């Protein structure tokens, strides 16, 4: 009985060592699990970006409105005879301190170009 017990204890020790420290043990499993989670998060971000790009491509292929909007926003273009107004936040915002009847007032400046 002593030899069988010793053999089982040694086998149990070897299995525990393999589980915790050995190749493909718990540490490797946790590292790979973290790597998979990181890659899945990265894939989700890239999929979202791809979906946005495909939607933008569809808009650009669909008509002139998307192209016109892009020209206005990114290139600052306007149509002939059109007046462009840009609202600029006021740098001198008035801040009031006191009663609840007083309010914060800030009025945007307006600039126009032809």
UniProtKB/Swiss-Prot annotation:
GO terms for biological process: FtsZ-dependent cytokinesis. The chain crosses the membrane at residues 4-21. Residues 31-62 form a coiled coil. InterPro entries: Cell_div_FtsB (IPR023081), FtsL/DivIC (IPR007060). It is a single-pass type II membrane protein. Keywords: Cell cycle, Cell division, Cell inner membrane, Cell membrane, Coiled coil, Membrane, Transmembrane, Transmembrane helix. Residues 22-114 are periplasmic. One of its GO terms (cellular component) is cell division site. Its main location: membrane. It comes from the Bacteria. HAMAP family: FtsB. Part of a complex composed of FtsB, FtsL and FtsQ. NCBIfam families: PRK00888.1. Essential cell division protein. May link together the upstream cell division proteins, which are predominantly cytoplasmic, with the downstream cell division proteins, which are predominantly periplasmic. This is Cell division protein FtsB. It comes from Edwardsiella ictaluri (strain 93-146).
């Amino acid at each position: 009985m002593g030899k069988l017990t010793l053999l089982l204890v040694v086998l149990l020790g070897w299995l525990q060592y393999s589980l915790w420290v050995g190749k493909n043990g718990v540490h490797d499993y946790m590292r790979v699990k973290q790597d998979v989670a990181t890659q899945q998060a990265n894939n989700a971000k890239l999929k979202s970006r791809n979906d946005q790009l495909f939607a933008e491509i569809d808009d650009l292929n669909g008509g002139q409105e998307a192209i016109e909007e892009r020209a206005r926003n990114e290139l600052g273009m306007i149509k002939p005879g059109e007046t462009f107004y840009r609202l600029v936040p006021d740098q001198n915002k008035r801040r009031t301190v006191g009663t609840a009847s007083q309010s914060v007032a800030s009025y945007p400046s307006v600039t126009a170009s032809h």
